[in-house]
């Protein structure tokens, strides 16, 4: 096999050894699997997963990736957002589920040469630069949350806010490098709202009433065209509290617009943290479910809608009414409660259009 050259990136779950040593194996294994799956899901397109190594993910890239640091920071935030949803979703009192928040993430980035070998039907990689990258996981950086970059890696990526550092590796020598502290990035993951919008939180609200039962309204929302473009989040009001329509991450939404794709399952088997990506007008709008309750009398679901230059929370309440049922929609721009945050004027119009479609579908079902 020819010698290849590129970026070597390792993501390591910090604190996992202590976590697994002091908790129940079956649940700690499930938790690690979900976290590693989250890392793999949000891997930048220019990185290729070379191997899953216990509590670490190992990527390679032979492409120029100047924005790698920004991508890894996003990955760190996504990891901690997932941890938060896992904590919110679990009802298990075991030590593993109760202490999942103690885990965190660190990265090592190096650039060097390696050789790909095919062994027993699988690719394996060898080379002194791979050894170096893995040895750097055990280091003297005064943190558990960081990106450690060798000077070889720094020559090909953009990295601001670095702290100079060096490590001495036995049989290799002194390695000049730098690290970026990530602890402050936790705030971005914890800033996302996890509660429904109260009436006083809403910057805009609208209500539709239907001369039909809650179940009939749900049936109408299952109609392929009821919610229209960008309306996949309405399915979260009528679907049971399992992954949307029973779908798996990476699949299209059953019965929905073909531009809607379920990209991430909910945490710990719930719907919390579930993501739908809406591809519309060349843009991608992320719809992340942050809270949901449902029974035969109604539903409440709050979605975080993240698009180009906007971030909006939408709480939808489907409930019984004296004349049948009603849907109330509340909207607020992030950060909620900040007088400076402005709700894009088009959002209320889009929501009202969706509600009009649902009303038409309910009426059509009643005439059938």
Region spans (language model):
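Short beta-strand segments that buttress and anchor functional surface loops
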Residues: 272-281, 300-307
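Hydrophobic pocket/interface hotspot
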Residues: 217-221, 227, 243, 276, ...
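Catalytic beta-strand-to-alpha-helix segment of the class III nucleotidyl cyclase homology domain
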Residues: 64-171
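Catalytic NTP-binding/metal-coordinating core of nucleotidyl cyclase/transferase enzymes
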Residues: 1-71
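Short beta-strand-to-loop capping motifs
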Residues: 13, 59-63, 207-214, 333-335
